Design a protein with these regions (language model features):
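Specific transmembrane helices
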Residues: 1-128, 155, 224-272
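Transmembrane helix-loop-helix hairpins at the membrane interface
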Residues: 112-269
Length: 272
């Protein structure tokens, strides 16, 4: 399944963690929403984790370049071709379908700047909430209370497995040989554990599901903004670069003793 219908289905699928967590909290979880961290959070945390997530994406694209995963094309042709394809799927011509006064180049500028800034707030926090309310806001704490490594490693793998169905509704840019597909899966599994750990850290540090949603969607949107000027040469190298970047992120948090926030957070919630 691909094209417009695949995109709609993917958007609906992204809300399933929030729906599952909502129903579980309403009918099967005695504390209900008392530990859901639905507080707005501190403004400085929004700024802090927006900048950190933006930086992580920037470093990942540097690694893509160094590893030969991408080449750069600052004409924006990559974005313009994708935009034209999206309109073609619906049977529309790009020039005729754009709002009056808008050109494809203007759309490129709007999407680039928006992906780095305002799109991460509206609708970013709303779309990011769909995953975070379920995964970091409910699944992660439940697993962590069993054993910390279960919350981190098993939680990360479950989050990774949850993403796999998206491959069937979102068209893939390239078809890879079996060995590359297998290697990709292993690399992405490790990368997912690291990314899950980073987002769980944001959740425990900020104690706000909305700050966590912002951190998550900022990585997604800034990656999209950079991708408008990047031509993929080797998908495996790109995925390796992303995983190495997230490993570096977790290593920095570890050596700065920032990961101790988990023990502090769960001790506080247990006594509270």
């Amino acid at each position: 399944m691909a094209g417009q219908y695949g995109a709609y289905l993917a958007q609906g699928y992204m809300m399933t963690p929030a729906i599952a967590a909502l129903l579980t909290r309403l009918f099967f979880y005695p504390p209900k929403f008392s530990d859901a961290n639905l507080r707005f959070g501190r403004l400085k945390d929004y700024l802090k984790f927006w900048l950190i997530s933006l930086g992580i994406t920037g470093v990942s694209y540097i690694s893509f370049t160094v590893l030969g995963g991408i080449t750069w094309d600052f004409s924006g042709r990559v974005f313009l071709d994708k935009l034209a394809q999206q309109f073609a799927v619906t049977g529309q011509d790009i020039q005729a379908a754009l709002p009056p006064g808008f050109t494809p180049s203007m759309m490129l500028l709007i999407y680039t700047i928006g992906g780095l800034t305002v799109f991460n707030v509206i609708p970013g926090i709303i779309t990011g909430f769909g995953e975070e309310f379920g995964h970091r806001g409910f699944m992660f704490p439940m697993l962590y209370k069993i054993k910390p490594w279960i919350g981190i490693i098993i939680g990360g793998l479950l989050w990774y497995l949850w993403h796999i169905p998206l491959a069937f509704v979102i068209p893939q840019a390239t078809k890879l040989p079996f060995w590359q597909t297998t290697l990709n899966l292993l690399i992405l599994a490790l990368g997912s554990i690291c990314t899950h750990t980073y987002l769980a850290y944001v959740y425990a540090k900020s104690e706000s599901i909305f700050v966590t949603a912002l951190a998550h969607i900022t990585m997604n949107n800034t990656a999209a903004s950079f991708s408008y000027y990047a031509v993929i040469q080797n998908q495996v190298a790109c995925n390796l670069g992303l995983t190495l970047t997230m490993l570096l992120t977790i290593a920095i948090l570890y050596f700065r003793k920032e990961l101790r926030v988990f023990a502090k957070y769960f001790c506080a919630t247990k006594t509270g």
